[in-house]
Amino acid sequence: MGKGGNSEDAVSGKEHGEENMAAWLLGIKTLKIQPYILPSLGPYDVKVRIKAVGICGSDVHHFKTMRCANFIVKKPMVIGHECAGIIEEVGSEVKNLVAGDRVALEPGISCNRCSLCRNGQYNLCREMKFFGSPPTNGSLANQVVHPSNLCFKLPDNVSLEEGAMCEPLSVGIHACRRANVGPETNVLIMGSGPIGLVTMLAARAFGAPRIVLVDVDDQRLAIAKDLGADDIIRVSTNIQDLDEEVAKIQSTMVTGVDVSFDCVGFNKTMSTALNATRAGGKVCLVGLAQSEMTVPLTPAAAREVDIVGIFRYRNTWPLCLEFLRSGKIDVKPLITHRFTFSQKDVEEAFETSARGGNAIKVMFNL
């Protein structure tokens, strides 16, 4: 496998006479567009001119705190990982792509040697090098170098912005696969932020007949309803309201909750999911807001409610692109804000995403 876009120590330079620029995270809420030296092109690599980059919640965490979960930014790092672009150059052994192809990039490079990789669980590889996850540089840049097998050609009717949206959509698709969502699966989703919404879109594409979204924010719930939620339920942040809210969820679902997705990851959201899910059902933990939670596991175990988790995704890009090509999923309404790749716009875009509000997906057009 090639090196990919991981020139971790390079901060300045030119690439074939053209300055390659990137958005470097230098400190808390400090981003600066600076030169970025690309690694040399390996035989199985491609050079991609990046055209669309979305801002993810993990990018915002890095921007605001210089860390996300256990990943800590200790030195300047190029930010970003949701991306698509146009092939500019291919390595000597690349056969499936040519210059000019439009591609969506899967951002994680696994080792392909460990037992997890050999078992097909490459997303859990301990040697993973993931765009914009320290210490690996990201994709908010004019150009990146990336392994060709992680670049997926876009169908003619799928835009570069939609290609960049394959990354968050992959989270929803992987979650639905882990939970075995199908045409007879009634789905509850805790949280109507970006990940809750893509999980809803994925569940519908997998055939879920009824989907209910729960949130504390009326504005987000209204967006979920517009995007196709069968019902929406506003809840409080007060744990004392849990039993009443679970009863409301169950009456709204009518036939029972087969699968619950917690796309938030708080004590209350996970407790709600566990209590609302029918006996023999499944709860999938997607959001990881809290590292530790106190939740009612014993009653859930007594009802044989299975609990599964996800970490990122694996083998999802081809299905993402097919759902987008066929129209089974439309991610365009999720893109609420667009910015150019200028110093001013980079700063404003991250502040916009950090504020939340009516911003769902903030997208750069390079």
From Swiss-Prot:
Protein species of origin: Vitis vinifera (Grape)
Family: Belongs to the zinc-containing alcohol dehydrogenase family.
Leader sequence segment: none
Binding site for Zn(2+) 2: 111, 114, 117, 125
A Pfam family assignment: ADH_N
Catalysed reactions, semicolon-separated: L-idonate + NAD(+) = 5-dehydro-D-gluconate + NADH + H(+)
Name of this protein: L-idonate 5-dehydrogenase
The protein's required cofactors: Zn(2+)
